[in-house]
Amino acid sequence: MSKEKSLVVDNIQSLEELISSVKEAQRIFSTYSQEQVDKIFTAAALAANKARIPLAKMAVKETGMGIVEDKVIKNHYAAEYIYNAYRDTKTCGVIEEDKAYGIKKIAEPIGVVAAVIPTTNPTSTAIFKTLISLKTRNGIIISPHPRAKESTIAAAKVVLEAAVAAGAPDGIIGWVDVPSLELTNTLMKEADIILATGGPGMVKAAYSSGKPALGVGAGNTPAIIDSTADVILAVNSIIHSKTFDNGMICASEQSVIVDSSVYKQVKEEFTKRGCHFLNKTELDKVRKTIIINGSLNAKIVGQSAYNIGKLSGIEVPETTKILIGEVTSVDLSEEFAHEKLSPVLAMYKAKDFDDAISKAERLIADGGFGHTSSIYINSATENYKLAKFEEAMKTCRILINTPSSQGGIGDLYNFKLAPSLTLGCGSWGGNSVSENVGVKHLINIKTVAERRENMLWFRAPEKVYFKKGCLPVALNEVKTVLGKKKAFIVTDQFLYKNGYTKCVTDKLDELGITHTTFFNVAPDPTLECAIEGTKAINSFEPDCIIAIGGGSAMDAAKIMWVMYEHPEVDFMDMAMRFMDIRKRIYTFPKMGEKAYFIAIPTSSGTGSEVTPFAVITDEKTGIKYPLADYELLPKMAIIDADMCMDQPKGLTAASGIDALTHALEAYASIMATDYTDGLALKAMKNIFEYLPAAYENGPHDAKAREQMATASTMAGMAFANAFLGVCHSMAHKLGAYHHIPHGIANALLITDVMRFNAAEVPAKMGTFSQYAYPHCKERYVECANFLGIAGKNDDEKFENFLKAIEELKDKVGIKKTIKDYGVDEKDFLATLDEMVENAFDDQCTGANPRYPLMSEIKAMYLKAYYGKEVNPEDIKTK
């Protein structure tokens, strides 16, 4: 016997001493290895198993309840089945590790467990709780029921002595020698966790103690016997369960609800197997005995049917197994509708399955929410009924064709149901757990998460064809490789009327491909336009869609493509923002099932031919919605400089700076990669070198046109994978509210945004695992170096880079401010706050290296309007 347990715990002072000593023992125990713990666990389980018979005898003698032979089984179960379930479970140190994902889970003990033990199962519950506490390196102090204190303490002593002999710290298990409500409440308040098994009052006290508690709820298990049930199996299973230890397991059946079609057969089988059906007089006598003043009569708990008969003043054979009362009411005014914890059973006749479920629901609601329910049924043929039963029962254990006493505690009739003598009842039963309590509930798990970088990607159309004059060669594949027969062309009126589509339609005619053209796409295409185009597509039923034009035509065509292939989609769902394109709530439908999508650009800026994006405007609200999903990627992109030769100067300038902004934002993005960086840098170099010539010489400089077409597509590929930033967010809203062309809007904002991003002490930086610290200025300097822009240091190089961009804008005729483009000051200021909020919420904002505050977006808008820093407070006073 340990030195500490020479202490007799019978008052608060001695309890405090015990708690202190167990805490010290647990502190030492918490340093033990898994190997040491498993040795102790094994020794304790062996000792408990060896003592199963004397402990059972002691429990029955002390409490006057139950059956020795059945308590032997319970003790055996508590030792052997609990040991077997957790013998290989890791409960110490690192219990799980995934080096690839950088996750490690470490188990730590909780501390000291306060274990409240019931009078119904004193020794087996003590064995169970001490064993799972030892397995988890916790100390445990047992508060026994006053009627079962000697046997409970004896069980704890057996486990303690074996554990200490195997190396456990002295005094790792303790107990209250003279239990009282005051001592139990004090123990619960000072322990680290409570394992409460007992009546509703005790469980409620545990949950009110202010400490984490694992308790059970009341059980009032109903068992339905369906018309399809194996009656012999059902009746004998219920008898086996209800008579086990005279019905003292809380999961035991309290009522049986029998379908009327088999009621007679069930009654005959119960009678044949030694059960007694009470007549009316006997029924009334037993009613008065089992429930007194609305509560269970403690004198009947764990008694035999014969002894309960004697208490009730009725005579039944001594061999009677169960007293069965045939009753009709499931209301609590009916004594037989209560939990009885004895071989007394209510029996109801159900007119049909729905009636049976209704009765079971009421019995559970009034006395057993969360605990256990049972059904006997042909599970192979009655799936519908089973599903209905499972849905209706608010219990955490639903047993099928199983004796509920043995089935509910687990690992006897189903080997995936964890063995336990503390059965959680979930929130329905006022519990914190809804499963059978085990070792996992007595450990704290520390999750160690190492920083990991996201898997990145590079996505592009499956076919990208480029070179001046490549269009007719690439289009051959539409017939020879793809086998397409009908092509629907989407373009705008200007391109259609000026013959830009003729080279495509002539080639389609040559290939024998039927075609039609929709040319009502306007700049900033609207939903109305997309719907109109979709009607034409539905009428034509093409197997190929060809978008010819700038971003507007390609964006409109992408939306039409989606509506054609998936008319069921909700546009607002598609436009929903996401933080990570792979984790978005809305999943885009699979595209390309009906039609193959080909994009042919006629301007050098948007890059839409190689991006998964489309911008569409709601004509009713004026709001622009940027859609993004890789399902929107064209299947084929054809970049033929011949299609871009005749761009007017204004379009050349706007689209050229748009492409530059794509490259700059892709390079600065928190999602930039080596794969996108090269494309972005080469695009920038092409634009700085060839945009002025393309602007000045137009169709007379084929090389400049081709290099700009290449730059646009490379920048498109870069931002298709690295995404954009707040410059585009702001430009989208500037275009929507004040109708400034998109490329011009970007041009007016880009250098202010770059200066904003380059701050080394930003208010907030972007969130992405790869983005380690604010280093956007370094990134911009890398661009400057690649472009050959010099400077004495990084700061000077950055400033010179900004100057070079401004000079490039000057060369292509772009004005300095928003105001210069005729936007009325009053109108601008009236819409400013709304633009700011919508820009902040734009899909592009999330990838910006500096996460913008709305006040910062507002300041950038004001600077872009006035061409100088402006105090927002001064604006308010205007």
PLM feature spans:
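N-terminal Rossmann-like NAD(P)+-binding subdomain of aldehyde/semialdehyde dehydrogenases
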Residues: 2-104, 132, 272
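Rossmann-like NAD(P) dinucleotide-binding subdomain of oxidoreductase/dehydrogenase enzymes
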Residues: 94-233
